[in-house]
Structures are given as C-alpha cells and as structure tokens.
Amino acid sequence: WLFPHRGTELYSDKPPMLMWLQAAFYTVTGNWRVAFLLPSLLAALGTLWCVQDLAGRLWTRRVGLYAAWALLFAFQFTWQAKKAQIDPLVTFFITLANYGLLRHLLLGPAWRWWALGWAAAGLGTITKGVGALALLMVLPAAIAAVRGWPRVRVHARDRRFWLGPLAFLGAVSVWLVPVLAVALSQDLPEYRAYLDDILLRQTAKRYSQSWDHHQPAWYHLGVMASMWIPAVLALPWAIPAWRRRLRRRDPRYLLPLAWWLLVLVFFSIPDGKRDVYIMPALPMMCLALAPLLPGILRRRLPRALLLALALLVALLFLAGGASVLSGVGSLPERLREQRGLDPQGIVAGGWMLLAIGAWGLGCVLAFRRRAVAALSATLAGLWVVFGLVGYGLLNDASSARGVMAAAGRRIGPEAELGLVAWKEQNLLMADRPAATFGFKRPWDEQLQLAVAWQAQAPDRWLLVLEDALEHCLDPQRIELAGISNRRRWYLVPPDAVVAPCEATPEERARAAAGQARDLEE
C-alpha cells in the first residue's frame, strides 16, 4: 500500500492515491474493470457538482447549470472522465480545493471550507504533485483584498487562518509520514532511490529539467483551443465582457480568471508538456464563463458557430464511416495495421461511425433553430454510441487483453511466460504469473536476462515487443502474438534463440528510442 510495485520494481512515478482507490473499489466490487473506472467517474461527477454548486452560490442556480453543462460537454473533460487515468482525480481534488477556498474568500469567512480547501489541495498533492497549484487562488485574493476590492477577504489576521496550512500538511502526511518512516528505517538502497525519485526527480527536477514531452511555450494555448471545445468558442465574446467586469472590480471573475492564468503560466514554463496538464484549469474557466453564456447564446453568430460545429462533427463521422466501409482512403488500413482490428471489427467500426454521423445530421436538421440543443444532442449521441460500441471494438487493440489472451492460448496452460519491453497492462492481463526482468532496465539488457531465464527450464516462452527484437532470434521461428496500442508483440519459443543476444549498436539505438517513447507515454 505504501510502496506500489510495477513487476519487481518500486513504482515511483506517482504517489499511490489512485492505486489506493482502485484497490479499495476492487475490494468492494471484485471487478478490476469497474474498480479502475470508478475513480475517474466519481471524480468527474464530483468536479461537476463543485462547479455547479459554486456558480449557483456566486450567481444563480441557472448560472450553475450553465457552468456544469459547459464543463460536461468540453471534449477533454468527457474524454478523460471515461478513462482509468489519474488526471480526472487530480482535477477533482484541485477543483474541490478551489471550491473550499472560494467559499471562504468570496462568501466567507467560512473557516471549515477554508480548511477543506487546503486539505483537498493536500490530497491532490499526494495524487499528483501539482495538486498544490490550487493554493495559488490565495494570491489574487490577497492582492485584491489589499487593493480594496469589495466582497473578497483572506482574513489573514485571524488565528484560524492557520487551519488551512495545517489541514494541507495533515492531508499530505497521510502518505508522506509513513512512507518516510518505513523507507528510512529499512536502510535499503531501493527505498532511498524511491524517495529521491518521487520527492525530487519526479517533481522539482521534472519541472526544471524536463526529459520528455518537449513542446513549445504556446502548446497549451493550442490544447485549450482544440480540446476545450465547445465552451472555448465563447471566448471572443467572453473576453470583452470579462474586461468590463474586472473594471467594475468584481472578484467573482478576478479569482478564477487569475488562477487560470497562473496555472497556464506555470505549465508553460517547462519544456515538458502534455495536453492533460492544463485540464485542472478547465472547471474554473467554465465557472467564470457561465454567467455570460445566456447573453452570448442569444447572439446570432455564436449560435451559428455551434450549429456549424455540430454539422462538421456529423459530416466527419459520415465521411469516416463511408471510407471504412468502402475501403477508400487510409483509415481502414490504419485500423488494420495500427489497431489490429479484424475485417469484422473494421466493418462494425464503419457502421458505428455512420450511425454517429447520421445521428448528428439528424440533430442538426431537427434542431436547426436551436443550435445549443443540436450540438448537445450530437455530442451526447457521439459519447453514448462510442461508449457502447466503440470501446468494445477497440478494447483488445487499445489494451493488452487480446494479445495476452492469444499468447496464453498459443503456449498452452502448462508453459511459463516471460515479458520483455512490457507495459503494466501486459502483466495485469496475463492469464498466469509472468516473469519480468525490470521495467526501466534497458530493453537489450531485459532480453539478455530473459533469454538466460528461458534456457533454465523447458517450455518457457517470451513475449517481446517488436522494437526489442534482436538478431539472436530466428525470424522464421518467432510468431506474431498480436497488435495492441499500435505495437506488435512477438512470441519467442525456446528454439528461436540461435545466437548470444548481444545487441548491435543499431539494435541498441532502436530499443533505446522505443523505450524513451514508451516512457513518455
């Protein structure tokens, strides 16, 4: 529980909060798929509630509903909420922290909410280090209070102010104190390395000296413009309105907008950037945008823009479905080569795309005078159909389930299996205990250890990623196990090793490049 493992190695990329929740839900449900998805689902629902309730308290109940709908239909939010990843959870804790802080700063004094906000930031920190960014909300509030803005107070002179920092330390200590106590008492080098990695390398060093996901400084502007659709389409009308309200010194706009700007600057400074990094700022954008949406949506041009977006989505899916079913274009080939879909799966995928496109076109025609309804219905149909049909079609290709099932059938129930250049899902979805030879260890060294392990007993097989194959393996004897996550996996039987596995410079460079790419993902 304190030190999760990835195979035989300690997992120090992230604190274990997400894994705690998944393990707890597995204890309750006994189903790994449900246990993996529940944290993201509940976190997304919690984020929606925070935004809806806070907007309702700061303005009106109707504004709260606008804020929640804007967030729900933002592409990045919905996409991530349907995946078993850490980002919806950290977004929830940051949003909950913002909720508590704003309840105190704008509607307070409310010391319980103040303490809850800091505690949520602490829980966000032991989920993913950036959870503490929620506390930046105090900075614009303090500046506004000093400059005499109405209806905003930090109440820093009150002794109860320190309940917040204490709550933050208490939440962080839930994980940090026992981890430090156990690691320092063990006096084992792997535990010291774990502390160095998770407390220093994965935080300060990753920020100051990013070694992966290199992107230009303006990268997150493109992410927001493309992945925060449709809410972001209102910005040309919202920005002048925000400017007017800031001139009137309305802190309800200043605090979420200033915090959004601070988060954007924070994530734009390092070279390493990913699209999900900026997602925790999306709820605050929707909060500040919501009071303006009723007026913006009464304008003709914004409504035309939303209707055009719905039509574009429908036409793109219709074109994609027609391409897949007719075999014209590169899409069918990509589904076959990169996703490993069989002909039946490709045909089913084509009909799914056509169904989504037809639904969208029908929504545009039925609600052509109600652009918001047309786009909302189109996006709702897209997510429902894709969730019910698309995930089933792509499950084997987007996870290791298909490859591991095929490998298990091929080698038989009595054989042993070793993994080289593996991902966590390979180990999870294997139908038997599998031998591993390190995760961060270079792939060529993994292969050497795996071949030595294979030679120690009969009926041992290796599952090897294509980029980790070397000249020591007879290409006529290895077998393609399948394709998952756009990668080809090969089974290596005992008689396929025909020479010592000493990687050539070209093989070592190819493996190193592939491993770096995998670690970036």
Provide a role label for each language-model segment:
Residues M352-W359, R370-P494, R508-E520:
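Short periplasmic/luminal acceptor-recognition loop of GT-C membrane glycosyltransferases, typified by
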Residues L38-L58, L96:
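Transmembrane-helix motifs of polytopic, lipid-linked glycan transferases
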Residues R57-L58, R62, A97-L116, G124, ...:
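Membrane-interface transmembrane helices that cradle and orient dolichyl/undecaprenyl
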Residues A119-A120, A132-D275, M284, P291, ...:
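Transmembrane-lumen/periplasm boundary regions of multi-pass, lipid-linked membrane glycan transferases
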Residues W1-L10, M17-W20, A24:
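Extracytosolic helix-loop segments that constitute the early lumenal/periplasmic catalytic or substrate-binding loops
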Residues V51-F73:
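Transmembrane-helix signature of polytopic, membrane-embedded enzymes
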Residues C50, V90-L107, M285-A288:
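Specific aromatic-rich, kink-prone transmembrane helix
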Residues L37-S40, W79-V90:
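Short acidic/glycine- and proline-prone juxtamembrane loop motifs at membrane-interface regions
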